[in-house]
Amino acid sequence: MNEPVYYITYTSRLSMRYFLDTQVIHELCEQAHHNNQVHGVTGFLLFRQGRFLQYIEGQRDAIKQLYSNIQRDPRNIDTQILLEGTRDERLFDQWAMHCVDMAQHDSSEDMSRSFAKFDPQTWGEDKTCEVLHEIKHFYEHSKTPLNDIYPPQPISYVGLQVRALARQHSSFMMLQVAFLLAALCVFGVTYLL
C-alpha cells in the first residue's frame, strides 16, 4: 500500500523590503521548481499584489521541511496554514511547481470569479477548497499549462500596483489626457495670437 500524500495549503505576503525587486517572483518560482523536483514535491503558487497562496504535496517529511524553510525565508511574512492533511493520491502529479500571476487573470475568462478578490489570508476552509477545486479542474481540462497562460512578469510589486491602478482607472486617465491635450491646444492658440 502506498504512503498517503501529505499536503499543506498556506498563504503569506511578500516582505516589504522586496517590493522593488523585479526578479523576486521569478527567483521564487525557479527556486521552488528546482527544489520541488529534487524532493518529489508537486503543487502550485498563486500570487497577486504581494499575496501568495501555495499548495504543496508529497512525502510528509519533505513537505514539513519545505514549509519550515518557507517560514524562515525573508521574502515571506505572515505565513499561515489554511489547509493541511493527507490524501490517497496527488492532485497535481505533473506540476513540480506552477507559478501563476493572478494579475494576468483580470482580463481572462479562463477561471471563475473564485479569484475575483485574491486575498487568501481572509479565506476560510470552504473558500480555499473552492480555489483548489478550480485549479484542479483547470489542471485536468486545460491543454495549456496554467503557468504558460499566466507567467510571472519581471516587474516589482510597486510596478504591479501601478499597472493594476492604471488598468482599473484607464477610462478616467484617458479623459484626463484628452483634457490636457485640449488645454494645451487652447493655450497654444492663445499664445500664438
Regions flagged by a language model, labelled:
Residues 1-193:
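Charge-rich, low-complexity N-terminal segments
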